[in-house]
Amino acid sequence: MNMAGFKETQMKAIETLNSIKKPSSSTNSAFKYIPKISGGGGSSSANRQSSIYTANTLRDKQVKEKPSNRIVYDIVNYLKTLEGIPADTKEIMHSTNHMIDDKPEILELLRNNEKIIDHGNDRFSFKPKFNVRTQRDILDLLPNYPGGILVSELAESYNNAESDVKKLKETKQIFAIKAAESACDIIFPNDERLRVPLSSELVDMWKSIKLPNEADLEKEMKDAGLSVVESVESARQTKSTKLKKERKKRITKVTNTHIENFNPNDDVPQLGSKPI
């Protein structure tokens, strides 16, 4: 092809391109997606926020919902702080944040609870084991229980019970020992009528007695058929277990099993021996 023919072909191509019309802007806008908004521009956003709020509210309600036994436990502990004063359901709901007015099963559990007194009209109060409020009440109660009273049970009666027990111990109006099953004290009355006068000679003899060490005392008790208190024995075993920790053994894996019993010194002649 000569130069004149090439130029003619090029001009035809340019004319063909110019004959093709570009799509107008109106055509593009016709295919543009425009979401339909009903009821104003802000209603869609408001509805979306409302649905999110509703979902979050329901989720929070499900998380905060507690089982019935936990609700009753919280209510019993709250009533205990009132020291026998009755409380209605409104006060209970306000103080415990548990909505129980629309839960008849919770009210039924409260009525049948042995630690709660039902006063009627949805009014409840805590029922302690001992009805005491002062130090004098404690001193009057103790003679009726020769086996002693647990301080934890006495503390259910009123908030300052443990403080009053401590004061009675300091003034030696009561005696206290540790319970074998727990760390709680058992208190007894200090009855002056049970005091027996002793001679100074007998007191000196008592003080001169030397107690054996703990190991010998335990052996002598076992020889006499007496058992050691479980709490003391278990504590001693726990302490000895901590002191006697076994040392971990290092596990070595043998890889060259084909020469496991091979000793390279077997064929080496010893010093002073004749060569083979």
UniProtKB/Swiss-Prot annotation:
Residues 62-133 bind DNA. Keywords: DNA-binding, Nucleus, Transcription, Transcription regulation. It is found in: Nucleus. InterPro entries: TFA2_E-tether, TFA2_Winged_2, TFIIE-bsu, TFIIE_bsu_DNA-bd. CDD domains: TFIIE_beta_winged_helix. GO terms for cellular component: transcription factor TFIIE complex. Pfam families: TFA2_E-tether, TFA2_Winged_2, TFIIE_beta. Its main location: nucleus. GO terms for biological process: transcription initiation at RNA polymerase II promoter. Residues 256-276 are annotated as: Disordered. PANTHER family: TRANSCRIPTION INITIATION FACTOR IIE SUBUNIT BETA, TRANSCRIPTION INITIATION FACTOR IIE, BETA SUBUNIT. Recruits TFIIH to the initiation complex and stimulates the RNA polymerase II C-terminal domain kinase and DNA-dependent ATPase activities of TFIIH. Both TFIIH and TFIIE are required for promoter clearance by RNA polymerase. Belongs to the TFIIE beta subunit family. Tetramer of two alpha and two beta chains. This is General transcription factor IIE subunit 2. It comes from Dictyostelium discoideum (Social amoeba). The gene is gtf2e2.
